[in-house]
UniProtKB/Swiss-Prot annotation:
Organism expressing this protein natively: Methanococcus aeolicus (strain ATCC BAA-1280 / DSM 17508 / OCM 812 / Nankai-3)
Task of the protein: Catalyzes the attachment of proline to tRNA(Pro) in a two-step reaction: proline is first activated by ATP to form Pro-AMP and then transferred to the acceptor end of tRNA(Pro).
Keywords: Aminoacyl-tRNA synthetase, ATP-binding, Cytoplasm, Ligase, Nucleotide-binding, Protein biosynthesis
Single Gene Ontology MF annotation: proline-tRNA ligase activity
Protein's UniProt name: Proline--tRNA ligase
EC number: 6.1.1.15
Swiss-Prot/TrEMBL domain comment: Consists of three domains: the N-terminal catalytic domain, the anticodon-binding domain and the C-terminal extension.
Record InterPro entries: aa-tRNA-synt_IIb, aa-tRNA-synth_II, aa-tRNA-synth_II/BPL/LPL, Anticodon-bd, Anticodon-bd_dom_sf, Pro-tRNA-ligase_IIa, Pro-tRNA-ligase_IIa_arc-type, Pro-tRNA_synth_II
Amino acid sequence: MENFSEWYHNILETAGIYDLRYPLKGCGVYLPYGFKIRRYAFEAIRDMLDESNHDEALFPMLIPEDLLAKEGEHIKGFEEEVYWVTHGGTTPLDVKLALRPTSETPIYHMMKLWIKVHTDLPIKIYQIVNSFRYETKHTRPLIRLREIMTFKEAHTAHSTSEEAEAQVQTALNIYKTFFDRMGVPTIVSQRPEWDKFPGADYTMAFDTIFPDGKTMQIGTVHNLGQHFAKTFELEFETPEGGKDYAYQTCYGISDRIIASIIALHGDEKGLILPPEVAPHQIIIIPLLFKGKEEIAMNKAKEIYKSLKNTYRVKLDDRDIRPGKKFNDWELKGAPIRIELGPRDIENNKLTIYRRDTGEKFQIDEDNLLNELNTLIDSIENTIKEKAEQKVKSFITILDNHDVNNIKETLSTKKGVVLVPYDENIYTEEFEEEIDASVLGTTEYDGKKYISIAKTY
Ligand SMILES: Nc1ncnc2c1ncn2[C@@H]1O[C@H](COS(=O)(=O)NC(=O)[C@@H](N)CS)[C@@H](O)[C@H]1O
């Protein structure tokens, strides 16, 4: 783990997650194993959004130039990142089309057609799509992509600012719970004015801390106020018969949550996957001794059948040495392995190996389902607690704003530095001086701080 970046790039390939050899910078391929991790992670966020009365929808990827340019601050914020389509075949287009960097403009253009009276509100929709940003900084697989393959963007419209404010809190809770379920600890900051989402009133951001001590923004919640509503004329008739503009929020996560699960939970042997997103939660490995293969294989099939409706279980019956199988599944981060040899079977025992702690222990076969139940919970908690300890060890609270102190801490301890909030230093000049990013203002242990870090 000394060279985290090397470890990270290697694991994407050796664990069969992602192939970055695609011949276009900032783009890569989700391999089947990685695709399953992505699928289970985004199934979790889908469940949570649906649970919270959001509706999934789907909007076009192509945005006509005049539509994208409609909200001044927004287009200014994205003009250096937008990809343009200029031809249909050999025919030049009369209006060039943007590949969506994000979908405020197409969605709010349609909302104008949907919103007439206050009872048409609230609207709470989301889509999980690819989006495109011509990132000029260092691109990194699943971290800084030019084609963001898994861009979950939610957009809401409300009839009062109080309701929009409440929706921001709801979104923050959804993300907090989601990142918790992924075992990824985060620090929440309100981004500074100079680094908020283009066109937003304010931006709340979730940052996690990678093993190399750099932070990464893995989710954002924006209160858009009425900026976009005024630009897109999202006007509605109020209950009193008057007129008002809608109050909006939007919030997004991306492939970065996949990168975080890999980065925060992995170790020298490879991935350690939270059971919720593991493509295979349990691997059954029959130990085939000469002349006794049948016993182990039959028992393995029996156990497979007894588990397959409850867990994502795989029977590894490849004709290779057990040790090779053990290494493969430790590399791929399968949470639980069940080994069974003829002697175990005679004694009605099974050997369990848990990837998160590396422990190996015997259990009674009749007790398997109960054991697995408690084991899955224990693994989830252990993975989460380990990550929490690592992230906590990367947080330093200073009781002063001394620039050298801050720089010293960032270069030695790394991670996040919290200094007492003071509006006089909450400036871009200060950010220049410390040669790091001001993440924003952060509540920590009930106090208000300015959070500072080197970021991805
Ligand atoms: N180039 C990128 N590669 C991967 N993820 C990215 C990239 N750019 C942004 N993200 C992720 O996408 C999230 C949402 O992007 S954003 O610009 O902050 N917010 C929006 O686009 C709003 N429309 C809410 S979806 C960010 O918090 C970040 O985690």
